[in-house]
Curated annotation (Swiss-Prot):
Its main location: cytoplasm. The lineage of its organism: Bacteria, Pseudomonadati, Pseudomonadota, Gammaproteobacteria, Alteromonadales. This is Peptide chain release factor 3. It comes from Shewanella sediminis (strain HAW-EB3). GTP binds at residues 18-25, 86-90, 140-143. It comes from the Bacteria. PANTHER family: PEPTIDE CHAIN RELEASE FACTOR RF3. Increases the formation of ribosomal termination complexes and stimulates activities of RF-1 and RF-2. It binds guanine nucleotides and has strong preference for UGA stop codons. It may interact directly with the ribosome. The stimulation of RF-1 and RF-2 is significantly reduced by GTP and GDP, but not by GMP.
Length: 526
């Protein structure tokens, strides 16, 4: 077996998706604890308590002024090397979150068992559907009172349109949470409270009919036997092929805060989740075992510190191997670059990367030349596909305090849109500039960066725009007619792509009915 194949086979690259407050940060913590990356997990407490989560723990790096928001954490587990990509929480939610999902091979979906499927989870699952990403599910917060577990699985199946196969099943919940039954191993793992900061030695009872179970949990033993008869009759069995096709999700129950059940998920990810997969380019499919290096940029982390203009581009390695000091070909620019200072993120600490393999994420210092979707190779003219732009969900008109700086404003907005910080739209019929974003924080960041980096002071105004769609049509004549009749709703984005700006969803739906030959797209390839 080649050295590269051994390294590829070891890797599992996944992201955690959840609604805010479902426990994603706590799970990230505990996952790192099991990966020996942390000795004692720091629970996410109120910010005043001084005990911050390790994945929220990097203050802005003082010397470079870059915040890397622990976007990537790499750690060993059971003979595998796991790359966990963090998706930002509600405060800094942006398109970055969506695009991070294009750089992983599987996802862990975390659901608050008291609340069930929530809005952000629905949105993120839509994005995983673009590539049929395999999903592992964790029903969290069993140490609180929860909804009926069968009802929770039913909701996942109906709302997210994915079959559920329980792997573990809860025994009690809240103050009466006793542990879980592992359906595939035929064993009960008992829960001990107050062990959240360390890896606990769990008590395992083999077999549901074992008298030790009755001795350990009393009347709950009979209840769980009865309940499991119903569960086994009403639920799906785990099927690896369906899981890898993104059609079925294995479901685990536990409490991240109590550090119970997290190792069960990791066991499942290492055993079943795909190793780094082949990636499509415009020319051919790139296999991870290919000898020559290739990778693509899926995220650019801009500094939030006006004193520094440096940023880091996050690259997923797709084939070959990165070695310190190697020469890479930046395909879009047609230029070769020597890369000697790429970063790796072992358990959240930034280190210089000496070597990286397919599935790994490296950070490249970017002085404004890299864009999202850029491909790097060892000379081959490839371009990876499947790194999309998403239609924004919030819009503002942006206006200058000094009208003479229109040129600088446009330049700044176009550059920031290339970097993925925001999207900009120029209506065809007016001189307005409309900024679109997925998260509210993006607007604030853009105004701050326009001021510090482009010396432009701008303010936002409300605008009646509900959504945007990129428009295409194979028939040039029909497209021209559409442009003429709908010009008041049309704009060009930062890359000069034609976009329909809809004041309401009703307006969009009417236009789609009226012009059936025009394609209105929610996403656009970078």
């Amino acid at each position: 077996m080649s050295g590269n194949k051994v390294e590829v086979d070891k890797r599992r690259t996944f992201a955690i998706i959840s609604h805010p407050d479902a426990g994603k940060t706590t799970i990230t913590e505990k996952v790192l604890l099991f990966g020996n990356a942390l000795q004692k997990a720091g629970t996410v407490k109120g910010k005043k308590s001084g005990q911050h989560a390790k994945s929220d723990w990097m203050e802005m790096e003082k010397d470079r002024g870059i915040s890397i928001t622990t976007s990537v954490m790499q750690f060993p587990y059971n003979g595998a090397l796991v790359n966990l990509l963090d998706t930002p929480g509600h405060e800094d939610f942006s398109e970055d979150t969506y695009r991070t999902l294009t750089a992983v091979d599987s996802c862990l979906m975390v659901i608050d068992s008291a609340k069930g499927v929530e809005q952000r989870t629905i949105k993120l699952m839509e994005v995983t559907r673009l590539r049929d990403t395999p999903i592992v599910t964790f029903m969290n917060k069993l140490d609180r009172d929860i909804r009926d577990p069968l009802e929770l699985m039913d909701e996942v199946e109906k709302v997210l349109n994915i079959a559920c196969a329980p792997i573990t099943w809860p025994i009690g919940c809240g103050k009466e949470f006793k542990g879980v039954y592992h359906l595939l191993r035929d064993e009960v793992i008992l829960y001990q409270s107050g062990q959240g900061h360390t890896i606990q030695d769990s008590t395992i009872i083999k077999g549901l009919d074992n008298p030790e179970l009755d001795a350990a949990i009393g009347t709950y033993a009979a209840e769980v036997r009865e309940e499991l008869e119903l569960v086994l009759g009403a639920s799906n069995e785990f099927d690896l092929e369906l899981f890898l096709a993104g059609e079925l999700t294995p479901v685990y129950f536990g409490t991240a805060l109590g550090n119970f059940g997290v190792d069960h998920i990791l066991d499942g990810i290492v055993e079943w989740a795909p190793k780094p997969q082949a990636r499509e380019t415009e020319v051919r499919e790139v296999q991870p075992e290919d000898e020559k290096f290739s990778g693509f940029v899926f995220k650019i982390q801009a500094n939030m510190d006006p004193k520094h203009r440096d940023r880091v581009a996050f690259m997923r390695v797709c084939s070959g191997r990165y070695e310190q000091g190697m020469k890479m070909h930046h395909v879009r620019l047609g230029k070769d670059v020597n890369v000697s200072d790429a970063l790796t993120f072992m358990a959240g600490d930034r280190n210089r990367a000496e070597v990286a393999y397919p599935g790994d994420i490296i950070g490249l210092h970017n002085h404004g030349t890299m864009r999202i979707g850029d491909t790097f190779t060892q000379g081959e003219k490839l371009r990876f596909t499947g790194i999309p732009n998403f239609a924004p969900e919030m819009f503002r008109r942006i206006r200058l305090k000094d009208p003479l700086k229109q040129k600088q404003l446009l330049k700044g907005l176009v550059q920031l849109s290339e970097e993925g910080a925001v999207q900009v739209f120029r209506p065809i019929d007016t001189n307005d500039l409309i900024v679109g974003a997925v998260g509210i924080l993006q607007f604030e960041v853009v105004v701050g960066r326009l001021k510090s980096e482009y010396k432009v002071e701008a303010i936002y105004e409300a605008i009646s725009v509900s959504t945007a769609r990129w428009v295409y049509c194979d028939d040039e004549r029909k497209l021209e007619e559409f442009r003429r009749k709908c010009s008041t709703n049309l704009a060009l984005d930062g890359g000069d792509n034609l976009t329909y700006i809809a004041p309401t969803m009703v307006n969009l739906n009417l236009s789609m009915e009226r012009y059936p030959d025009i394609k209105f797209a929610k996403t656009r390839e970078n």
